[in-house]
């Protein structure tokens, strides 16, 4: 089984691309989805112990947690020390299931793939990319997003140009959905030797 690592800076279309891989029949693991599950499950008491007042009714309040760690590298390290091992456990379970299902390709969607060294655990890296103006427009259209938040997020992410230079495949997400589907189908066919499943 070939494991693809999908990554890209915020607002580059990672979630959309991951959804299209899934539509094409590729098992997909999302680190972000895992974090959401963990924040309302077993990570919540650990986060409350580390950052008191950030959990309400057993669920991590993401806004409060963001305020507790923004601009504080040591606090971010503490949070990562709690969350990353749990996310990794979920990823390992996903890989076992995908392998058992006989999948030729599986995809792990990890926003901080390079930043956390996770590229060492995948066979090929796929980076989603779009021009900076499109990226900023997409991100600032999100509810609750501000220029300050965007800057804080981008500071922690390796620049897009470097990600592209380290990728095995680059998906240009600035065009139409059909164009993106075509790019994804080419990757799947090239790696598996079989046409991608129907994406509609």
From Swiss-Prot:
Binding site for ATP: 11-16
Native organism: Brucella melitensis biotype 1 (strain ATCC 23456 / CCUG 17765 / NCTC 10094 / 16M)
Pathway listed: Cofactor biosynthesis; coenzyme A biosynthesis; CoA from (R)-pantothenate: step 5/5
Domain of life: Bacteria
Protein name according to UniProt: Dephospho-CoA kinase
Family statement drawn from the similarity comment of this UniProt entry: Belongs to the CoaE family.
EC id: 2.7.1.24
GO cellular component: cytoplasm
Gene3D superfamilies, A to Z: P-loop containing nucleotide triphosphate hydrolases
Key word Transferase present: yes
HAMAP family listed in its UniProt record: Dephospho_CoA_kinase
Top-level enzyme category: transferase
Catalytically driven reaction(s): 3'-dephospho-CoA + ATP = ADP + CoA + H(+)
Molecular-function GO term, any one: dephospho-CoA kinase activity
BP GO terms, sorted: coenzyme A biosynthetic process
Keywords: ATP-binding, Coenzyme A biosynthesis, Cytoplasm, Kinase, Nucleotide-binding, Transferase
Main location: cytoplasm
Residues of the DPCK domain: 3-200
